[in-house]
């Protein structure tokens, strides 16, 4: 029988190649805060990705609510990237999230 720890990420220990410390130390840039960006950030937060950066220049619109899991009606008019980061932190307070509301080309290599 396999022993599983009490860690938040204990179920991942069942995957023999999984290395939580690598994901926890990772710096990941998500370009775009639409439906796909929402899902990616949600999953990264839930799995404990250490440092998530999100860039998007748009604001949350009504049409986003039916396809973007991290947006709520109360977020209408707010920057998508900022809202996504706030929700990711609600999902997992142990991660670091930072947003940019500018084109990815302007971020440079020092993100």
Give each language-model segment a name.
Residues 1-111:
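Adenine nucleotide-associated cytosolic modules
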